[in-house]
Amino acid sequence: YVTEQWDPVPAYHDILMKLVADSLRGCPELNTALIEGNIVQHDLVNIGVTTDTERGLLVPVVHDVRSKSLQVIAEESAKLVEQTQAGTLPLDKLREGTFTITNLGMYDIDAFTPIINLPECAILGVGRIVPKVVVVDERTLTTGIRRIMALSLTFDHRLVDGGPAAKFLQTLKSLIEKTQ
């Protein structure tokens, strides 16, 4: 999926952005917003990535993620993070997010409950990746060590029910497991 020649090499959040955008195809309800009492269905998937700065938390947005290659996402994301950290991010790069990803894995957090970035419908919380013993064959109960990452989805029940949200997570899980 990723080659070493890429510059920059995509970070986990870049890969997750692409996989989230693909997963939202099957659950467009999560790509909505409640604006002035109206449910707005977004055509584009614009994903914000939470970024901790000396000035507080900011959420720069990669626009139209579905139409971009992983390499382009990685390039844009790296530039956004750099500008955010430097305090030079243009305000328009903080606008029009339709879904947010937040990652606390670098702080050794396994799982957490993220708070929705309103007016968006949902936010995906990403925990650290850790090796764990898991059953790899349910028929024989064979175990093995696999790298596991917890995902926490917080969503607005006014906009989407639990079933579609669970379907989104199921699709995302499947895509992550297939990605090498």
Where are these regions (language model features)?
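C-terminal catalytic/motor cores of large multi-domain enzyme assemblies
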Residues: 1-180
